[in-house]
Amino acid sequence: MSNSVELSSYRDQHFKGSRSEQERSLKESCTLYVGNLSFYTTEEQIHELFSRCGDVRLIVMGLDKYKKTPCGFCFVEYYTRSEAESAMRFVNGTRLDDRLIRVDWDAGFIEGRQYGRGKTGGQVRDEYRTDYDAGRGGYGKLLSQKIAPNTDNR
């Protein structure tokens, strides 16, 4: 197996099953996790990029669990493992909406996983960010809440 399609060290802590079941699922999966997307990247843009590597079966955009707005990740499922491997080789680390995107193996989409797992509804990584990132909603959400003036106590 080529280095570009090997499993990374990341493991979904919410996976339902044993570590060996998760490893097996990842090694057989046709589903990819795509991260570091702009909040403004569309499903159509994802489809255009990933369909260069094969027939895309399904795209599930990651959503803020409260606002139901995009929050910077998605799942892309192919019909075959070889198509997904091509995407791992050729799409991981490329630019989309002026951002370097990350592509990693996923054990398979399960309903509910499309929602951010952070306290504020988005991704955890966006809650504590201290730098300003226009493509991902500005400053980190928890930092923004501390900075925002409290208008309730007037």
UniProtKB/Swiss-Prot annotation:
PANTHER family: 20 KD NUCLEAR CAP BINDING PROTEIN, NUCLEAR CAP-BINDING PROTEIN SUBUNIT 2. One of its GO terms (molecular function) is RNA cap binding. The gene is Cbp20. MRNA binds at Y10, Y33, R102, V103, D104, W105, D106, R113, Q114, Y115, G116, R117, Q123, V124. Component of the cap-binding complex (CBC), which binds co-transcriptionally to the 5' cap of pre-mRNAs and is involved in various processes such as pre-mRNA splicing and RNA-mediated gene silencing (RNAi). The CBC complex is involved in miRNA-mediated RNA interference via its interaction with Ars2 and is required for primary microRNAs (miRNAs) processing. Also involved in innate immunity via the short interfering RNAs (siRNAs) processing machinery by restricting the viral RNA production. Keywords: mRNA processing, mRNA splicing, Nucleus, RNA-binding, RNA-mediated gene silencing. It is found in: Nucleus. This is Nuclear cap-binding protein subunit 2. Component of the nuclear cap-binding complex (CBC), a heterodimer composed of Cbp80 and Cbp20 that interacts with m7GpppG-capped RNA. Interacts with Ars2.
